[in-house]
Curated annotation (Swiss-Prot):
Function: Transcribed prior to replication. This protein form parts of the replication complex and has DNA-binding properties.
Record keyword Nucleotide-binding present: no
One GO MF term attached to the UniProt entry: DNA binding
Gene Ontology BP annotations: DNA replication
Protein name, entry field: Protein rIIB
Species name: Enterobacteria phage T4 (Bacteriophage T4)
Subcellular location per the Swiss-Prot or TrEMBL entry: Host cell inner membrane
Disulfide bonds: none
Position of the signal peptide: none
GO cellular component, one term: host cell plasma membrane
Alphabetical UniProt keywords: DNA replication, DNA-binding, Early protein, Host cell inner membrane, Host cell membrane, Host membrane, Membrane
Length: 312
């Protein structure tokens, strides 16, 4: 189960209810709550896990999983489904499986089966689970549900995201450049705290291993605190790392501040602007422990664009 800090229990329950109605896509729900699609997926996955029966097994058991899933046939009468061109939701014996064109390679085939009233086949297609017994690429090794970098096991929110993407059949290798960039950070505390920032689920990782965050600035693009740093689109803003406070118990202190989407609504004024910034994981110095790990202090970032209209 995922620990989702940026949404209340009631908000998560409402997301599950609306998504199950078939009237909203994951992206629409993400825009509504001001979070990422990853957050919505985790909410839905938690809901699925909560419905599954708990089984206790004792004794010595050996299990071997490969990429070909064996699925028991299901009776048509046990299947409830909703579908559109943008999403599919199929419930079998109280367990719900969701798919979108971006998350399931067989989306169109499943949709065609539902339209043709071939519910058993559609349920089987959407329920295919893929697992990798062993994966090795460069310094990264995934084995037995664990990730190792240079033979050292890593446990973190980032690792959870990689393993989750692998389970869904998504491109989990996309995260490796980010992992390598992160390990360039000289602060072990910053590395660990950045994983907490990722768990906030508002973080978009780029192909070159950076990540996007957000910043509230004045109407003239200068920073709100000192009015000395120009945050106009295209600018690279930086300061010596040694001048950034690395104490994550201090909320407001020295450093270049950026935040997640969920923090934007708690800050700024009617004349403020919001800019999207690109940050190298190496340049993260500290993440204050308040506000659900939703903001951080860095020593450098690049301003990508003005996104004020997205937050109105």
């Amino acid at each position: 189960m995922y620990n989702i800090k940026c949404l209340t229990k009631n908000e998560q329950a409402e997301i599950v209810k609306l998504y199950s109605s078939g009237n909203y896509t994951q992206q629409e729900l993400a825009d509504w709550q001001g979070v990422s699609v990853d957050t919505i997926r985790r909410v839905l996955k938690n809901a699925e896990e909560a419905k599954r029966p708990k089984v206790t097994i004792s004794g010595d058991i050996t299990v071997k999983v490969n990429s070909d899933a064996v699925i028991a046939p299901v009776a048509k009468s046990d299947i409830i489904w909703n579908a559109s061109k943008k999403f599919i939701s199929i419930t079998v014996d109280g367990v719900t499986y969701n798919a979108t064109p971006n998350t399931h390679s067989n989306f169109q085939e499943i949709l065609n089966l539902l339209v043709a009233d071939k519910l058993e086949e559609a349920a089987q297609k959407i329920n295919v689970r893929r697992a990798v017994e062993k994966y090795i690429s460069g310094d990264v090794r995934i084995e037995g549900g664990s990730l190792f970098y240079q033979n050292i096991e890593l446990r973190s929110g980032l690792v959870d995201r990689i393993l989750d993407s692998m389970e869904k059949g998504e491109n989990f290798e996309f995260y490796f450049p980010f992992l390598e960039n992160l390990l360039e950070n000289p602060s072990q505390k910053a590395v660990s705290r950045l994983f907490d920032f990722l768990v906030a689920n508002d973080i978009e990782i780029t192909e070159d291993g950076y990540f996007y965050a957000w910043k509230v600035v004045r109407s003239n693009y200068f920073d709100c605190h000192s009015n000395t740093f120009d945050n106009s689109p295209g600018k690279v803003v930086k300061m010596p790392r040694t001048r950034v406070n690395d104490d994550d118990t201090q909320t407001c202190s020295r450093g270049l501040h950026v935040c997640s989407k969920s923090y934007i609504r708690h800050f700024g004024s009617s004349t403020s602007r919001v800019v999207k910034v690109k940050v190298h994981p190496r340049d993260v110095v500290s993440i204050p422990i308040d506000y659900n790990d939703a903001k951080m202090r860095t020593c450098q970032y690049e301003v990508v664009e003005d996104v004020t209209e997205q937050f109105k």
